[in-house]
Amino acid sequence: MNQLRKIIESAFEKKEYISNNNIDSTVNNAVREIMDRLDNGTLRISEKINGTWITHQWLKKAIMLAFHTMDNQLITWGGGVFFDKFPMKFSGWDHTRFENKKLRIIPPATVRYGAYIADNTVIMPSYINLGAYIDVGTMIDTWATVGSCAQIGKYVHLSGGVGIGGVLEPIQTNPTIIEDNCFIGSRSEIVEGVIVEKGAVISMGVFIGQSTKIYDRASGNIYYGRVPAGSVVIPGSLPSKDGRVNTYCAVIVKTVDSKTKNKVKINNLLRDI
């Protein structure tokens, strides 16, 4: 692993001079190995280590190098013809492979090579970009978008039209993270490396970026960049200092209780394949 990282870090420093015509075979092999391992989940962009999310920026650099070094190719998919450097993730998969992974992929769901999809997931017609990580038992609902390198936990439900922000550049920026057992309501947007902690419920139409105030009405605390575990969040507003206008915020109205869980619970029958 350290050797792979050294190869990528060194090559990235001179990425402007690297192309598919002059790439060193050692670098090329390293980039392709990393893309394969992101695709199969043995590497991931960000992971929780000792309670803290750690982003492996060198893996993002490997993806950027892949854009420099991989050739565009014709992609025939869904009755159309496309032209890109990265194939569709499920190109070449057969019945047995889908069945063994216990996946349901509903057309025209689009998943790019380099995104990891864990077992027992349901992917409705949606878009999942490269470098993303979708963990076990999650449902990505219709027209949801999971951006590059976003990390989605176990048993998450991304409702219809949800947008989860992606990030490749700037390199030092962290991905958006949705932890285990979260529910993200329809048409909500979580972007800019925000972390939604375990078990949180986001109502429909909530927009959260790094500068969004997340107001806890019980305590009066204001959070930025993270939604505390178990929070139930709705859209709201707060008055300006002079009281002349109200500006948008997200409001924590309570913590998750049994009533909330029943409202957002995904019927296991929908997952039974």
UniProtKB/Swiss-Prot annotation:
Record keyword Repeat present: yes
Principal subcellular localisation of the protein: cytoplasm
A GO-annotated cellular component: cytoplasm
The protein's annotated pathway: Amino-acid biosynthesis; L-lysine biosynthesis via DAP pathway; LL-2,6-diaminopimelate from (S)-tetrahydrodipicolinate (succinylase route): step 1/3
Subcellular localization(s) per the UniProt record: Cytoplasm
EC number, UniProt record: 2.3.1.117
Gene Ontology molecular function: 2,3,4,5-tetrahydropyridine-2,6-dicarboxylate N-succinyltransferase activity; nucleotidyltransferase activity
Catalysed conversion reaction: (S)-2,3,4,5-tetrahydrodipicolinate + succinyl-CoA + H2O = (S)-2-succinylamino-6-oxoheptanedioate + CoA
Pfam (any one): THDPS_N_2
Alphabetically ordered keywords of this record: Acyltransferase, Amino-acid biosynthesis, Cytoplasm, Diaminopimelate biosynthesis, Lysine biosynthesis, Repeat, Transferase
Any one GO biological process: diaminopimelate biosynthetic process
Binding site for substrate: 104, 141
Quaternary structure annotation from Swiss-Prot or TrEMBL: Homotrimer.
Family classification: Belongs to the transferase hexapeptide repeat family.
Name the UniProt record assigns to this protein: 2,3,4,5-tetrahydropyridine-2,6-dicarboxylate N-succinyltransferase
Species name: Blochmanniella pennsylvanica (strain BPEN)
Organism classification: Bacteria, Pseudomonadati, Pseudomonadota, Gammaproteobacteria, Enterobacterales
Gene: dapD
